[in-house]
Amino acid sequence: MPQYQAVKGTRDIFPEEAARWKYVEGVVHAIASLYGFSEIRTPVFEYTELFQRGIGSTTDIVGKEMFSFLPDPKGRSLTLRPEMTAGVMRAALQNNLLSSAPVQKLYYIGELFRKERPQAGRQRQFSQFGAELLGVSSPAAVAEVITLMMQLFASLGLRSLKLRINSLGDTEDRLRYREALQLYFTPFHELLDDASKERLEKNPLRILDTKNPALQELVAGAPRLYDYLKDASLQDFEKVLFYLEERDIAYEIDYRLVRGLDYYCNTAFEVTSSELGAQDAIGGGGRYDGLARELGSSVDVPASGFAVGMERLLITMEKQGLFATLAPQGPLVYVIVQQQDLADNALQIVWRLRKAGIKTEVDLAARSMKAQMREANKIKAAYALFIGTTEETTGLYALKNLETSEQITLTLEAVLELLREQAVGEQLD
């Protein structure tokens, strides 16, 4: 066994899989741009208190899962980001983005870190993409980010996804509901696990998010938050549902859905895939009007957003066979060196081909012509260009189509022109 191994909870991504990541990222960039969202990139670590205030001190993320350390000269704890939304809001507030443009539409693709038990689709270092719509307080804004997310899934060809949605109401609604939950769960205090007992005092809504099988029946009998919503909250939620129906986006109201972060209010949603087993969430989000004030803003910044786990998305796509046609694309041409004393000349031709925008490969290991041809076919090159004494003497080069075996003889300039046209055609495809 090699002396050094990847750290538990991390993994290497090799070229074939990296091509899948690149494909998904390309679709994310395209659909986000279609909706008028611009990319933002924030630091991978922030002051720990940003997440304590933003995510919520009673959440599992803050209580158990953050990678925190103390290298700051002033003794302030730093944390590798466990989620993106708090950092995006911090960036918007710190840089006064909303004063120059009262509505900000931002999206991201980034690495995150949590101390979770490693399993399929859940690593300690993982990736998410998502979008945040800042500065708009309306059902239309929530519907906008949901529609963006669902169109993105559709563009990737995903099937059989379920959109679950609920209203968490406003602060007053949740305070009334909090009291109702405490009244309901307190008589069952001895049946609760340690985490739920702690949540009962600090934030009983978190009990509804428990994954403990022994508590599922008890949770199922709990009061519904929906029954504690005021008329304004109900109307807000119904308007979101109206927009989804107008756009033919199927949904299921899940009265137990609370999400795992404390900053959500009003609409919350989650998308699940049956391909992922018990841990079936592929992404989700909601509205978070109070986050800016939690981070020290003197004014409210209404906001809505979503995040999708890349690893879980890729697992779902793999299980649905969506990568079957995404074979790695080989070079357009493989330069075959027939005599090694011409290797330097061949490298000069390779440089000219690449400079012209033609994807070109060449053997750098001085292997036999037979081995070079075997490699050209293995990596699915479209053409082989032969460099030998005859070609150097006459200035005419043999170009072989490796799919049809048809071979033609051309000047180097004609080869460049032919392959350049092919390369442009591939880019247009």
UniProtKB/Swiss-Prot annotation:
<dbReference type="InterPro" id="IPR045864">
    <property type="entry name" value="aa-tRNA-synth_II/BPL/LPL"/>
</dbReference>
<keyword id="KW-0648">Protein biosynthesis</keyword>
<dbReference type="InterPro" id="IPR015807">
    <property type="entry name" value="His-tRNA-ligase"/>
</dbReference>
<dbReference type="InterPro" id="IPR004516">
    <property type="entry name" value="HisRS/HisZ"/>
</dbReference>
<dbReference type="GO" id="GO:0005737">
    <property type="term" value="C:cytoplasm"/>
</dbReference>
<comment type="subunit">
    <text>Homodimer.</text>
</comment>
<keyword id="KW-0067">ATP-binding</keyword>
<dbReference type="GO" id="GO:0006427">
    <property type="term" value="P:histidyl-tRNA aminoacylation"/>
</dbReference>
<keyword id="KW-0963">Cytoplasm</keyword>
<dbReference type="InterPro" id="IPR036621">
    <property type="entry name" value="Anticodon-bd_dom_sf"/>
</dbReference>
<dbReference type="InterPro" id="IPR033656">
    <property type="entry name" value="HisRS_anticodon"/>
</dbReference>
<keyword id="KW-0436">Ligase</keyword>
<protein>
    <recommendedName>
        <fullName>Histidine--tRNA ligase</fullName>
        <ecNumber>6.1.1.21</ecNumber>
    </recommendedName>
</protein>
<dbReference type="GO" id="GO:0004821">
    <property type="term" value="F:histidine-tRNA ligase activity"/>
</dbReference>
<comment type="similarity">
    <text>Belongs to the class-II aminoacyl-tRNA synthetase family.</text>
</comment>
<dbReference type="InterPro" id="IPR004154">
    <property type="entry name" value="Anticodon-bd"/>
</dbReference>
<dbReference type="InterPro" id="IPR006195">
    <property type="entry name" value="aa-tRNA-synth_II"/>
</dbReference>
<dbReference type="Pfam" id="PF03129">
    <property type="entry name" value="HGTP_anticodon"/>
</dbReference>
<keyword id="KW-0030">Aminoacyl-tRNA synthetase</keyword>
<keyword id="KW-0547">Nucleotide-binding</keyword>
<dbReference type="GO" id="GO:0005524">
    <property type="term" value="F:ATP binding"/>
</dbReference>
<dbReference type="InterPro" id="IPR041715">
    <property type="entry name" value="HisRS-like_core"/>
</dbReference>
<dbReference type="Pfam" id="PF13393">
    <property type="entry name" value="tRNA-synt_His"/>
</dbReference>
